[in-house]
Design a protein with these regions (language model features):
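Amphipathic, Lys/Arg-enriched alpha-helical "gate/interface" segment within cytosolic domains
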Residues: 1-142
Length: 142
């Protein structure tokens, strides 16, 4: 399955990584949800998610849309094994919508946490930190 450039799947880690650039809007979210649902159907095994929103320039969403997507994800994933969804965010608007998503998926197999620190997200997901960093970040750190 060919993924859009902002998405990468690490089969060895059972992890889908989303790195949006530019604007996060309804079209961007819909594209990610479509890929997510396709992978869930194709793989038939649970995988965690990591959303690195630090590269996004702007968030153009609204409460109604976030509620709709969160509730749809909650219902569509009902009865599946638990998965973790880590959201790395610094933007106040993104954090606000991520918290709403976490609240609405509470009690479902989708466990959402929001992080400001990449290492904490890596620890929670139980994956090596370097797998969550971009090539540019690795170059700057090295």
């Amino acid at each position: 399955m060919k993924l859009p450039p902002e998405l990468e799947f690490h089969d060895d880690l059972h992890l889908l990584i989303y790195r949006p650039r530019g604007v996060i809007d309804e079209a961007a979210v819909k594209k990610v949800v479509d890929v997510l649902e396709d992978l869930e159907a194709k793989l038939q095994k649970p995988f965690d998610r990591f959303s690195d929103t630090l590269g996004a320039d702007e968030v153009e969403l609204n409460f109604k849309y976030v509620i709709q997507v969160s509730l749809c994800r909650r219902l569509s994933y009902l009865g599946h094994p638990p998965v973790k969804s880590a959201i790395l965010a610094a933007d106040a608007t993104m954090i606000h919508y991520a918290r709403l998503h976490a609240l609405l998926t509470q009690g479902s197999p989708i466990h959402v946490r929001i992080f400001k620190d990449r290492k904490e997200a890596a620890d929670w997901l139980a994956v090596p930190l370097e797998r969550l960093t971009t090539d540019r970040e690795q170059t700057e750190a090295g």
